[in-house]
From Swiss-Prot:
InterPro entries: Leu_leader. Involved in control of the biosynthesis of leucine. It comes from Salmonella typhimurium (strain LT2 / SGSC1412 / ATCC 700720). This is leu operon leader peptide. NCBIfam families: PRK14744.1. Keywords: Amino-acid biosynthesis, Branched-chain amino acid biosynthesis, Leader peptide, Leucine biosynthesis. One of its GO terms (biological process) is L-leucine biosynthetic process.
Length: 28
């Protein structure tokens, strides 16, 4: 289950970064 928690955390972090940066600007 550790990998699931890590995946969720990564997704949340990614979403937070995307929200912080201008949408449509730099997309990874």
């Amino acid at each position: 289950m550790s990998h699931i928690v890590r995946f969720t955390g990564l997704l949340l972090l990614n979403a937070f970064i995307v929200r912080g940066r201008p949408v449509g600007g730099i997309q990874h």
